[in-house]
Amino acid sequence: MSSGGLLLLLGLLTLWAELTPVSSRKRHQFCNVPPEPGRCNANVRAFYYNPRLRKCIEFSYGGCGGNANNFKSRGECKRTCAE
């Protein structure tokens, strides 16, 4: 294969990698479930990942129960689900 062909192939692979949405990359499955406030009434500030909007959103967590799409900080949510 010529060097021009290799450059074209490399460029196409790079473009594909950049355009591939996060949802099709390896992401924890729990990042796709809706937020669950839990059964208690503590009203704790928490964050969940919204796959449709591709961002972490604040919600009120009851303090017990719920699911794994529940993070103490927006940064932790982003590191786990959005990167």
Curated annotation (Swiss-Prot):
Tissue: Expressed by the venom gland.
Keywords: Disulfide bond, Metalloenzyme inhibitor, Metalloprotease inhibitor, Protease inhibitor, Secreted, Signal
Molecular functions per Gene Ontology: serine-type endopeptidase inhibitor activity
Main location: secreted
Localization in the cell: Secreted
PROSITE patterns in UniProt: BPTI_KUNITZ_1, BPTI_KUNITZ_2
Domain spans labelled BPTI/Kunitz inhibitor: 31-81
Cysteine pairings via disulfide bonds: C31-C81, C40-C64, C56-C77
Pfam families: Kunitz_BPTI
Family per record: Belongs to the venom Kunitz-type family.
General remark: Negative results: does not inhibit chymotrypsin or trypsin.
Annotated function: Binds and inhibits MMP-2 and shows an activity in inhibiting migration and invasion of neuroblastoma. Intact C-terminus is crucial to the activities of this protein.
Descriptive protein name: Kunitz-type serine protease inhibitor PILP-3
Lineage of the organism: Eukaryota, Metazoa, Chordata, Craniata, Vertebrata
